[in-house]
Design a protein with these regions (language model features):
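A short, structured surface patch at a secondary-structure boundary
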Residues: 115-176, 214-222
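Positions in alpha-helical segments
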Residues: 55, 70, 83, 123-127, ...
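N-terminal hydrophobic signal-anchor/signal peptide
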Residues: 1-63, 229
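A residue-level signal for conserved active-site and pocket-lining positions in enzyme catalytic cores
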Residues: 7, 184, 212
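Short, glycine-rich, amphipathic interfacial segments at transmembrane boundaries or analogous
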Residues: 11-15, 20-24, 82-121, 179-200
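Acyl-group handling in specialized metabolite and lipid biosynthesis
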Residues: 37, 200-203
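A hydrophobic, helix-centered structural microdomain
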Residues: 40-106, 142, 208, 214-229
Length: 229
């Protein structure tokens, strides 16, 4: 795949049909098609336009809500309303991700992220922001700057990305996103290995139609609050 090559493997027809794997028939013999899968040539430039337009509209429509959130955060726990933390972007490039602060300013430590809703570092309003995913809204700035996309794999912390095996580093071949398959299919309810599987599936099958589907389904995921805390 890294060399851009495609090869085919003989397998059982019924095994691959249920897996949704692309196959070719050669003399009635099912061959699984493996290798490098590139999106449509216009996918990347159109996706960037969609990101810019979508993030701009989002900031205009959600601007009042973002200002309200910022005021509530500072009122409850004096300090900056937005925190910046290092994440790993496309091709391993480090960038500063923007989020609404959800922890008390004097105990802010995002090197170890909260793993449960009862974490004492989270403020009452911060818990509301996390459950409703409103804490993610400042990432629209990252999208406008070209560091993130509206849809993509979850942005990873550097100390976790440093432990990646070579095959896991393929997550870094595309821009991370505000939402993605991991976010709409369970978020923190999912084990880490399933998160990676969803990210790899997205990378191999990314398209504008797929991105649009994920954005629409994100609305339902946010309203259901599944896996959020």
């Amino acid at each position: 795949e890294d060399l851009g090559m495609t090869f085919r493997v003989v397998t059982n027809l019924f095994e691959v049909l249920t897996a949704g794997t692309p196959i070719d028939l050669v003399d009635d013999l099912p061959l699984v098609r493996l290798g490098h899968q590139r999106p449509h040539p216009f996918y990347e430039p159109i996706k960037r336009v969609v990101d810019i337009v979508g993030a701009s509209i989002g900031m205009i429509l959600l601007g009042p809500a973002m200002l309200w959130c910022a005021r509530r955060i500072v009122r409850e726990s004096p300090g900056p309303a937005i925190f910046r933390h290092e994440r790993v972007g496309r091709d391993g490039k480090i960038f500063q991700i923007h989020k609404f602060r959800t922890m008390y300013a004097d105990v802010e430590d995002y090197a170890v992220a909260p793993t449960e809703a009862s974490d004492s570092r989270i403020t009452p309003f911060g818990r509301f922001l996390r459950v409703t995913s409103l804490d993610e809204l400042p990432q629209l700035f990252n999208v406008l700057k070209g560091e993130m996309s509206l849809v993509g794999p979850r942005p990873e912390m550097p100390f976790i990305a440093d432990t990646y095996d070579e095959w896991q580093r393929r997550r870094l071949s595309v821009k991370p996103g505000i939402t993605g398959l991991w976010q709409i299919l369970g978020r923190k309810d999912l084990p880490m290995h399933e998160n990676l599987q969803y990210d790899f599936y997205y990378i191999r099958n990314r398209s504008l139609a797929h991105d649009l589907s994920i954005m629409v389904r994100t609305i339902g995921a946010v309203l259901s609050r599944r896996g959020a805390f």
